[in-house]
């Protein structure tokens, strides 16, 4: 069947030192279990704007309500299962994070740490491609 293109939002959360927050996907997930992934990602619901979806996902996944997103880019990501139009945002946030119970937690990574671990099967392919 043809894959419908659906909009997705991603938010990269940095602290003021330039470290990047990543979430750990739970082991029970079908897709990429146990891998580290972009801090926030989710589908835009029907009738929702990108901005509203972003706020909803950030609140659900990290418990943040007060942040200023900046749109970096958008691209199409296609896997064997789906085709996504991804809107990538970033924000700088130094407040407390309250990861959702659905996640296996998360932490800030330095750019060096991320570079050292690329290609080792620690991160999701979608994260590594960006």
Set out the residue ranges of the language-model regions.
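A conserved beta-turn-beta hairpin within the catalytic core of GNAT-like acetyltransferases
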Residues: 29-36
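Beta-strand scaffold of nucleotide-dependent catalytic cores
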Residues: 21-24
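Active-site segment of metal-dependent pyrophosphate-handling enzymes
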Residues: 27, 49, 55, 59-96
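Nudix hydrolase/Nudix homology domain
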Residues: 34, 73, 80-130
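A short acidic/small-residue loop/turn micro-motif
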Residues: 1, 28-29
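Short loop/turn microsegments at loop-to-beta-strand junctions
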Residues: 8-9, 49, 104
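Short histidine-centered catalytic/ligand-binding loop motif
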Residues: 36-48
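Acidic, metal-coordinating catalytic segment for phosphate/diphosphate chemistry
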Residues: 1-10, 14-16
């Amino acid at each position: 069947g043809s894959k419908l293109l659906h909009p997705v939002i991603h938010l990269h959360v940095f602290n003021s030192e330039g470290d990047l927050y990543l979430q750990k996907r739970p082991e029970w997930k079908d897709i990429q279990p146990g891998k580290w992934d972009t801090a926030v990602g989710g589908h835009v619901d029907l009738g929702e704007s990108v901005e509203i979806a972003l706020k909803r996902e950030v609140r659900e996944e990290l418990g943040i309500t007060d942040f200023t997103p900046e749109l970096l880019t958008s691209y199409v990501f296609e896997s064997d299962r789906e085709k996504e139009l991804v809107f990538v945002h970033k924000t700088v946030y130094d407040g407390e994070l309250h990861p959702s119970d659905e996640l296996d937690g998360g932490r800030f990574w330095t750019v060096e740490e991320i570079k050292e671990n690329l290609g080792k099967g620690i991160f999701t392919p979608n994260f590594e491609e960006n």
